[in-house]
UniProtKB/Swiss-Prot annotation:
Protein name: Orotidine 5'-phosphate decarboxylase
Family in the record: Belongs to the OMP decarboxylase family. Type 1 subfamily.
Recorded GO CC terms: cytosol
Annotated SUPFAM superfamilies: Ribulose-phoshate binding barrel
Entry keywords, A to Z: Decarboxylase, Lyase, Pyrimidine biosynthesis
Gene giving rise to this polypeptide: pyrF
GO molecular function: orotidine-5'-phosphate decarboxylase activity
Binding site residues for substrate: 11, 32, 59-68, 123, 185, 194, 214-215
The protein's enzyme class: lyase
BP GO annotations: 'de novo' pyrimidine nucleobase biosynthetic process; 'de novo' UMP biosynthetic process
PANTHER family in UniProt: OROTIDINE 5'-PHOSPHATE DECARBOXYLASE (PTHR32119:SF2)
Biological function: Catalyzes the decarboxylation of orotidine 5'-monophosphate (OMP) to uridine 5'-monophosphate (UMP).
Reactions it catalyzes: orotidine 5'-phosphate + H(+) = UMP + CO2
Amino acid sequence: MSNDKIIVALDVPDTESAIALIDKLESVTFWKVGLELFTSSGPRILEVLKSRQKRIFLDLKFHDIPNTVAGACRAAAGYGVDLMTIHATSGRDALKAAKEAVEEGAAQAGVKPPKLIAVTVLTSISARQLALDLKIPSELPEYALDMALMAQEMGLDGAVCSPQEVAHLRQICGDDFVLVCPGVRPTWAEAGDQKRSLTPSQAIQAGADYLVIGRPITAAAEPELAWKRISQELTTVV
C-alpha cells in the first residue's frame, strides 16, 4: 500500500511553521491546507507546496448560497490543487454550481480540474449531536449516505466521511467515487475531538481512498517516526 494514500493535515498557524513541517517531513507527498493556514498564509502556501512537487488538498469546506460558492470554487480551482471541499448541506443547487465553476476556473487557469469532494458530516459530530443539536432525525450513517448520494447525483467526484461510514458509502456509491476519511487515529494516538474514528489500516480496508491524518503525526514528539509508523502499518493492507 503506497503512502500517497495519507494526506497529512498542515494544521499550523502560519507559513513559517508550515514550511518547517514540510521540510521536516520530506517524504510526505500529499498535504492538506485548511482554514487556519489558508486564512493566515493565503495562496502563498500553495505555491510553497507546488514548488516542492507536493499534492494539495485544499480543505476550505465552502458553504454558502450557490452564486457565492460558485465564485469561490472558480477561484480555488485556478490554484492547481488536487482536491477541494464543499459542504453537502449547501444543497443541490450549490453543489451543481460548484462543480461547473471548478471546471470553468481550471480551464481559465490552464490547469487540471481538482476533484470536488462533498463533506457529509463532520467527524467531530456524534449521533447524539446530530439529533439534539442539529435537529436531524435521520440515523447518522444514513444521513451521511444521503449527503454523499446527493453529491454524486450533482456530479461531484467524491465525499468526505468518517471511517465508520466509509464501508457503507463504498458499497452504495461504487468504486469510482472518491472517499476521503479524516478522523483516523492509530491505536497509539489520542482520539482528541474525533468522535467516529478507526485506525489507518481499518479505514483503508473499509474502502477509503485517502486518509487525512494530522495531530498523530504533526503533534508527535517525533513526527518523522510517527509518519513512518503509520506508513508501515499501511504496507500490510492489501
